[in-house]
């Protein structure tokens, strides 16, 4: 009976749970799904991480290549993110060129990188005007059950912290790059941006970490990205219901709390990887 009602009237079915301050999956309105991260998942990548947010699963692989610095910024390198949402992760997506949702997600990640200054692009310069690192960050969604932006941001951060680049010098006689694979160093991660997403129901009610079904039924969504200093790095709201100043402040306060949880989880994972 309940399954039939959910199929015929999914929103009304959902509202009955919201009235009791809970959700069909058993969570409270402000409760996040179980979050896990595995670092170094791809042996052939220069850095990688696998993040699970409930059923939503994203893997990030980073490959470092040489490139010429931009002419207008000869002392900078590049960080190039790309989010892939294939039919593998959800039947909603099709093979071929990136769809709108994938393009929006890629631009969101690019904005997070730029606004948070997670990496100073000057740190990627090898020789000013001649050679720089290009970090290709491929974020592949393996299972899409909502809140893809939070999962992608977490996977990117963990993968960047996992990157190790070899020492590179320019031979003055030959003007060629010489790579010392025996001497590698980690990236200098300047900030730790963490995304926290919300869904708005009936223009007023906020829930955190929405599933795919919740995103579909919601009247709006919002993603807030904060760093460890409590600074707002990015705010993403693709239309939908408006929010009052008080609601927005509530979202930012919850995002600060969520940042501490994610940062603690990531610190524990990287601490466990260090040789004793």
Swiss-Prot record:
What InterPro entries would the database entry show?
ExoRNase_PH_dom1 (IPR001247), ExoRNase_PH_dom2 (IPR015847), ExoRNase_PH_dom2_sf (IPR036345), Exosome_comp_Rrp42_subfam (IPR050590), PNPase/RNase_PH_dom_sf (IPR027408), Ribosomal_Su5_D2-typ_SF (IPR020568), Rrp43 (IPR033196)
As for family, the record states: Belongs to the RNase PH family.
Q: What is the lineage of its organism?
A: Eukaryota, Metazoa, Chordata, Craniata, Vertebrata
Extract the GO molecular function terms from the UniProt entry.
mRNA 3'-UTR AU-rich region binding
Presence of the UniProt keyword Secreted in the record: no
Q: Where does this polypeptide localize?
A: Cytoplasm; Nucleus, Nucleolus; Nucleus
Q: How does it assemble?
A: Component of the RNA exosome core complex (Exo-9), composed of EXOSC1, EXOSC2, EXOSC3, EXOSC4, EXOSC5, EXOSC6, EXOSC7, EXOSC8 and EXOSC9; within the complex interacts with EXOSC5 and EXOSC6. The catalytically inactive RNA exosome core complex (Exo-9) associates with the catalytic subunit EXOSC10/RRP6. Exo-9 may associate with DIS3 to form the nucleolar exosome complex, or DIS3L to form the cytoplasmic exosome complex. Exo-9 is formed by a hexameric base ring consisting of the heterodimers EXOSC4-EXOSC9, EXOSC5-EXOSC8 and EXOSC6-EXOSC7, and a cap ring consisting of EXOSC1, EXOSC2 and EXOSC3.
Q: Which GO terms describe its cellular component?
A: cytoplasmic exosome (RNase complex); exosome (RNase complex); nuclear exosome (RNase complex); nucleolus
Domain of life according to the entry:
Eukaryota
Q: Which residues carry this modification: N-acetylalanine?
A: 2
Q: Kindly indicate whether the keyword tRNA-binding belongs to this entry.
A: no
Could you tell me which Pfam families the record lists for this protein? RNase_PH (PF01138), RNase_PH_C (PF03725)
Which keywords does the record carry?
Answer: Acetylation, Cytoplasm, Exosome, Nucleus, RNA-binding, rRNA processing
Q: Name one GO biological process term.
A: U5 snRNA 3'-end processing
Q: What does this protein do?
A: Non-catalytic component of the RNA exosome complex which has 3'->5' exoribonuclease activity and participates in a multitude of cellular RNA processing and degradation events. In the nucleus, the RNA exosome complex is involved in proper maturation of stable RNA species such as rRNA, snRNA and snoRNA, in the elimination of RNA processing by-products and non-coding 'pervasive' transcripts, such as antisense RNA species and promoter-upstream transcripts (PROMPTs), and of mRNAs with processing defects, thereby limiting or excluding their export to the cytoplasm.
According to UniProt, the name of this protein is Exosome complex component RRP43
Species annotation:
Bos taurus (Bovine)
């Amino acid at each position: 009976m309940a399954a039939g009602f959910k199929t015929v009237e999914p929103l009304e079915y959902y509202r009955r749970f919201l009235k009791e301050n809970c959700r069909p999956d058993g969570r409270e309105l402000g409760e996040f799904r179980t979050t896990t991260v595995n670092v170094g998942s791809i042996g052939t990548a220069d850095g990688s991480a696998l993040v699970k947010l409930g059923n939503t699963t994203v893997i990030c692989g980073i490959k470092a290549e040489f490139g010429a610095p931009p002419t207008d910024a000869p002392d900078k390198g590049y960080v190039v993110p790309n989010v892939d949402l294939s039919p593998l992760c959800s039947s909603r997506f099709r093979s071929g060129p990136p769809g709108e949702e994938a393009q929006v997600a890629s631009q969101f990640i690019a904005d997070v990188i730029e606004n948070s200054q997670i990496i100073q692009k000057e740190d990627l310069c090898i020789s000013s005007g001649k050679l720089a690192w290009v970090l290709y960050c491929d974020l592949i969604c393996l299972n899409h059950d909502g809140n893809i932006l939070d999962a992608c941001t977490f996977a990117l951060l963990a993968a960047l912290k996992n990157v190790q680049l070899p020492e590179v010098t320019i031979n003055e006689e030959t003007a060629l790059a010489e790579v010392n694979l025996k001497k590698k160093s980690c990236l200098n991660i300047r900030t730790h941006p963490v995304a926290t997403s919300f869904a708005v129901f009936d223009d007023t009610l906020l829930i955190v970490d929405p599933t795919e079904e919740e995103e579909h039924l919601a009247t709006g969504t919002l993603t807030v990205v904060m760093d460890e200093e409590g600074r707002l790095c990015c705010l993403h709201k693709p239309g939908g219901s408006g929010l009052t100043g008080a609601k927005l402040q509530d979202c930012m306060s919850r995002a600060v709390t969520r940042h501490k949880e994610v940062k603690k989880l990531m610190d524990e994972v990287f601490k466990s990887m260090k040789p004793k």
